[in-house]
A protein has these predicted regions:
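Secondary-structure junction motif
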Residues: 182-184, 189, 197-218, 282-286, ...
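Interdomain hinge and pocket-entrance segments immediately C-terminal to HTH DNA-binding domains
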Residues: 60, 66, 90-109, 123-127, ...
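A late-sequence structural motif
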Residues: 112, 178, 189, 260-301
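Central regulatory/effector-binding core of bacterial HTH transcription factors
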Residues: 95-159, 221, 228
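A short LG(V/I)-centered, amphipathic sequence patch enriched
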Residues: 47-69
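Short helix-boundary/capping micro-motifs
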Residues: 17-34
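Beta-alpha-beta core module
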Residues: 160-166, 170, 229-281
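Flexible hinge/capping segments at coil-to-helix
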Residues: 94, 161-197, 286-287
Length: 301
């Protein structure tokens, strides 16, 4: 008769292993911290499962049958493998070899990912980082399928089903070239509104942004002469024109040959956060990478 593995569990296999080692129900019970009747009952279940007596009573203990002897090594291996499965996963950055996919805007690429990579590579040279464009509309599905490990976005764009953590609070500043006629003069509200502006919008097709909302509250407007979809082109545009731009401070600090000025009005900043799926939440490697991302983003102030 064929044995049914569904009749077995780890506790029964532990009992069989102890019985094979001890050759005594009493000693096996003591080793397992169980009562003798409990181990006797387990032996009965084992005999039924394997359709074999397994042990024969003898004057000096129990003698294993040939079937029991044949089971000894496989049972020990199964228990060892099961124990290994239950051990906490140990993550070693130096030995890690996998790809981590980040969804990010060009702003996050420069402000967050560049310093992150600088810290990551000496610590975990085998981890490859893939950057893909951030798409809030498809982000949840991408994280569910494992296509994105982490996304860098704002709380407003974060799907509620994802875990998230704030990285830092960003503020806006004005950016213009160092030799701009306005560079060494106080930037008044009137002058700010009179200057021609470069605006960054997601699609590059909008001429209204957060600055316009702040100005509207004061009954003022700005003069937008160029709308682009990327922050990264701004320094080049500003370097060859007399335009001005309102940009996140972290990007402004990275631009060479530029002058940073405080806006003449209050412009609300934003929170940059990271978001990830429950499927990655408890993985030691993912936890380590998220912590490193948090540390490096908070150092770049």
């Amino acid at each position: 008769m064929k044995s049914d593995i569904r009749n077995l569990d780890l506790n029964l296999l532990k009992a069989l292993d102890a019985l094979l080692d001890e050759r005594s129900v009493t000693r096996a019970a003591a080793r397992l911290a169980l009562t003798q009747p409990a181990v006797s009952g387990m032996l009965t279940r084992l005999r039924d499962a394997f359709n074999d007596p397994l042990f024969i009573r003898a004057p000096h203990g129990m003698v294993p049958t040939l079937r029991a002897q044949a089971l000894a090594a496989p049972v020990k291996q199964l228990l060892t493998d099961a124990e290994t499965l239950l051990q906490p996963v140990v993550f070693d950055p130096l030995e890690a070899d996998f790809t981590w996919t980040i969804a990010a805007t060009d702003y996050a690429l420069k402000a967050v990912i560049v310093p992150f990579i600088a810290a990551l590579k000496p610590m975990a040279p085998g981890i490859r980082v893939r950057i893909i464009p951030e798409s809030p509309a498809t982000l949840l599905a991408q994280t569910e399928r494992g296509e994105v490990d982490i996304a860098l976005l704002t709380p407003h764009d974060t799907p509620p089903e994802l875990h998230s953590r704030a990285l830092y609070q960003e503020e806006y500043v004005c950016l213009l070239r160092e030799d701009h006629p306005q560079a060494n003069q106080p930037l008044t509200l009137d002058r700010f509104c009179a200057l021609e502006h470069v605006l960054v919008s997601w699609q590059g097709d909008s001429f209204r942004g957060v600055t316009d909302d702040a100005l509207a509250a004061l009954g003022r407007t700005q003069r937008v002469g160029l709308s682009v979809s990327s922050f990264l082109v701004l320094p080049e545009v500003l370097a060859v024109s007399e335009m001005i731009a309102v940009v996140p401070r972290r990007l402004a600090k990275m631009a060479s040959g530029m002058k940073i000025a405080a806006p003449p009005l209050a412009i609300p900043g934003f929170t940059k956060s990271m978001a990830w799926h429950e499927r990655n939440h408890r993985d030691p490697a993912q936890q380590w990478l998220r912590e490193l991302l948090l540390q490096t983003s908070q150092q770049e102030r």
